[in-house]
């Protein structure tokens, strides 16, 4: 079992420098890990045997042929809820259900596609993270390199400090604003991803969110008889299958079989978790969006967010460091202070505050071709008094 988990360990690996928040990691790491784990688990035949096993009477159709046919063409149950109750007793099935008219059938066409559906969902939840990695391009990692440890490193010296202070004191409104807008876009994309996946599951399983609600409710209340009854209407463990073929004389023949669907024993639990997880993720994502709307609209709230991890630094120092700067500059400082050693973070903000007080506002003239290189040219800006 551990062999399946080992390739996925890197998804949950904790990094020293994180350019994303907890909600983001719930989307792009935890959710992706869980979906891929479920997909790999369902594809492991050594744990569950054949995905379908059909029982037929004696005749010209072999058991293996029937299994392959029903796997490809799909099985069905009756729309009548009593079918699910009777399906736990083979005697009752033979005695009561007989032929099910086409109009009363509910087909399990999803059965062989669940593994791919889960893998597709994992890919969808990975998209915002791939976009952000491409746009962020390791900027925060390079700025925080070696300065995240609990003990202040020896190389936190004048040259290194000057490089960071010079970068933070200069004014790059378009650069930092773009950095923030891309982050907000990916945050919005995470929220849209949840909505899209909820819609996708609802379409594939024909009203999943309403049909599976009684099953999840029964599970949470530990009413296991009701749980078995309701979940079997969506994920039946026993279903019927009809095999049509031409007999020796040319007449149409029909073989109906009773098929066991062992993967649905796992599917019912996976999708009960998905039902709860996606709804919880949707609520958390909505609250996170509201948080960022408040951040973008409230200067006082931004000041408080930046000051909190820098305690006991005075608010006036932080306000001066942000004086004349846009929300993009605040976001960069916020990202740095969340990752840097607290002592280094306080020293940086205090030094930037003093530099602003002494030198006034600094505007950098962006060279063609991208960002400035302060590590090779720490004086690469023009000063303009305001």
Curated annotation (Swiss-Prot):
<feature type="region of interest" description="Disordered">
    <location>
        <begin position="358"/>
        <end position="386"/>
    </location>
</feature>
<keyword id="KW-0965">Cell junction</keyword>
<dbReference type="GO" id="GO:0005886">
    <property type="term" value="C:plasma membrane"/>
</dbReference>
<dbReference type="GO" id="GO:0005243">
    <property type="term" value="F:gap junction channel activity"/>
</dbReference>
<dbReference type="GO" id="GO:0005921">
    <property type="term" value="C:gap junction"/>
</dbReference>
<feature type="transmembrane region" description="Helical">
    <location>
        <begin position="112"/>
        <end position="132"/>
    </location>
</feature>
<feature type="transmembrane region" description="Helical">
    <location>
        <begin position="22"/>
        <end position="42"/>
    </location>
</feature>
<dbReference type="GO" id="GO:0034220">
    <property type="term" value="P:monoatomic ion transmembrane transport"/>
</dbReference>
<feature type="topological domain" description="Cytoplasmic">
    <location>
        <begin position="1"/>
        <end position="21"/>
    </location>
</feature>
<dbReference type="Pfam" id="PF00876">
    <property type="entry name" value="Innexin"/>
</dbReference>
<comment type="similarity">
    <text>Belongs to the pannexin family.</text>
</comment>
<dbReference type="GO" id="GO:0007602">
    <property type="term" value="P:phototransduction"/>
</dbReference>
<keyword id="KW-0303">Gap junction</keyword>
<feature type="compositionally biased region" description="Acidic residues">
    <location>
        <begin position="374"/>
        <end position="386"/>
    </location>
</feature>
<feature type="topological domain" description="Extracellular">
    <location>
        <begin position="209"/>
        <end position="272"/>
    </location>
</feature>
<keyword id="KW-1003">Cell membrane</keyword>
<feature type="topological domain" description="Extracellular">
    <location>
        <begin position="43"/>
        <end position="111"/>
    </location>
</feature>
<comment type="function">
    <text>Structural component of gap junctions. Required for normal development of ovary. Required for normal egg production after blood meal. Required for normal development of testis.</text>
</comment>
<feature type="transmembrane region" description="Helical">
    <location>
        <begin position="188"/>
        <end position="208"/>
    </location>
</feature>
<keyword id="KW-0472">Membrane</keyword>
<keyword id="KW-0812">Transmembrane</keyword>
<comment type="function">
    <text>(Microbial infection) Modulates the development of Plasmodium falciparum oocysts.</text>
</comment>
<dbReference type="InterPro" id="IPR000990">
    <property type="entry name" value="Innexin"/>
</dbReference>
<keyword id="KW-0813">Transport</keyword>
<feature type="topological domain" description="Cytoplasmic">
    <location>
        <begin position="133"/>
        <end position="187"/>
    </location>
</feature>
<keyword id="KW-0406">Ion transport</keyword>
<protein>
    <recommendedName>
        <fullName>Innexin inx4</fullName>
    </recommendedName>
</protein>
<keyword id="KW-1133">Transmembrane helix</keyword>
<keyword id="KW-0407">Ion channel</keyword>
<feature type="topological domain" description="Cytoplasmic">
    <location>
        <begin position="294"/>
        <end position="386"/>
    </location>
</feature>
<feature type="transmembrane region" description="Helical">
    <location>
        <begin position="273"/>
        <end position="293"/>
    </location>
</feature>
């Amino acid at each position: 079992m551990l062999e399946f988990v080992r390739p996925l360990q890197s998804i949950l690996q904790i990094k020293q420098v994180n350019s994303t928040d907890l909600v983001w990691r719930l989307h792009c790491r935890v959710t992706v890990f869980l979906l891929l784990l479920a997909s790999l688990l369902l594809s492991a035949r050594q744990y569950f045997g054949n995905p379908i096993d059909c029982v037929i009477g004696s005749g010209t159709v072999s058991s293996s042929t029937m299994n392959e046919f029903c796997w490809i063409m799909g099985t069905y149950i009756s729309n009548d809820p009593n079918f699910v109750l009777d399906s736990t007793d083979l005697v009752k099935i033979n005695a009561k259900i007989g032929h099910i008219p086409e109009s009363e059938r509910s087909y399990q066409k999803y059965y062989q596609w669940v593994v791919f559906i889960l893998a597709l969902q994992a890919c969808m939840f990975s998209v915002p993270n791939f976009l952000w990695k491409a746009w962020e391009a390791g900027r925060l990692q390079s700025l925080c390199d070696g300065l995240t440890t609990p003990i202040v490193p020896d190389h936190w010296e004048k040259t290194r400090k000057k490089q960071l202070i010079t970068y933070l004191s200069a004014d790059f409104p378009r650069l930092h604003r773009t950095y923030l807008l891309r982050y907000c876009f990916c945050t919005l994309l995470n929220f849209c991803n949840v909505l899209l996946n909820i819609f996708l599951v609802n379409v594939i399983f024909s009203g999943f969110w309403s049909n599976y609600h009684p099953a999840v409710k029964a599970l949470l209340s530990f009413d296991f008889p009701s749980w078995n009854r309701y979940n079997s209407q969506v994920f039946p463990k026993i279903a019927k299958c009809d095999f049509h073929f031409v007999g020796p004389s040319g007449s149409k023949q029909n073989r109906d079989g009773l098929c066991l669907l062992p993967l649905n024993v796992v599917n019912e639990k996976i999708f009960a978790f998905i039902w709860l997880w996606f709804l919880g993720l949707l609520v958390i994502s909505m609250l996170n969006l509201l948080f960022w709307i408040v951040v973008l609209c409230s200067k006082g709230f931004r000041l408080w967010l930046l000051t909190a991890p820098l305690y006991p630094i005075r608010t006036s120092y932080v306000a001066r460091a942000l004086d004349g700067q846009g929300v993009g500059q605040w976001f960069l400082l916020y990202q740095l202070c969340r990752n840097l050693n607290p002592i280094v973070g306080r020293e940086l903000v205090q030094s930037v505050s003093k530099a602003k007080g002494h030198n006034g506002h600094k505007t950098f003239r962006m060279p063609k071709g991208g960002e400035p290189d302060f590590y090779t040219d720490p004086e690469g800006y023009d000063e303009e008094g305001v």
